[in-house]
């Protein structure tokens, strides 16, 4: 239970350490995270901070949400995210505040959640990392076939959950234990070592690592 930030994946690049080592990093834009609601144990039963990120046209905002945002005095965003925190941290926030990138520090471990890139309909080899069958030596028809998917007349069906061909990607995915290489407070950017889920321009959620 700790405060995080919602951001946008800008893309990947590399930076160089003092010893000349090349470090692949993902650039995350976490600017303009604004507090829309502070939830307290007395009123809501738990302690949390709700933040908005991004922009949304007023014509695309429902009346209940517009009233909720007007009460906080913030503009609408296309993402509304809640972070549960400790009750003693609530005093540091109020509706309308900006949550800055400085809540993170260089060298800190974080978990980044995003939506993986959709790959469409894929076979079992690519989707589940199955091994291909023999290329020759008597095999002429089933090089990338998945093999048997069932048994005999008993049970007479394919069990639910059987790993087969199907849609791959476009699901929520989390990369755990990534290291923050640089915090750019002026441009509200995080540079995280390695890759994070999603395409360029997709939304991500950055939290302190649960296994740090």
Swiss-Prot record:
Signal peptide: none annotated. GO terms for biological process: translation. The modification N5-methylglutamine is found at residue 153. Methylated by PrmB. InterPro entries: Ribosomal_uL3, Ribosomal_uL3_bac/org-type, Ribosomal_uL3_CS, Transl_B-barrel_sf. GO terms for molecular function: rRNA binding; structural constituent of ribosome. GO terms for cellular component: cytosolic large ribosomal subunit. The keyword Ribosomal protein applies. Keywords: Methylation, Ribonucleoprotein, Ribosomal protein, RNA-binding, rRNA-binding. It holds the Pfam family Ribosomal_L3. One of the primary rRNA binding proteins, it binds directly near the 3'-end of the 23S rRNA, where it nucleates assembly of the 50S subunit. Part of the 50S ribosomal subunit. Forms a cluster with proteins L14 and L19. Belongs to the universal ribosomal protein uL3 family. HAMAP family: Ribosomal_uL3_B. This is Large ribosomal subunit protein uL3. It comes from Dechloromonas aromatica (strain RCB). The lineage of its organism: Bacteria, Pseudomonadati, Pseudomonadota, Betaproteobacteria, Rhodocyclales.
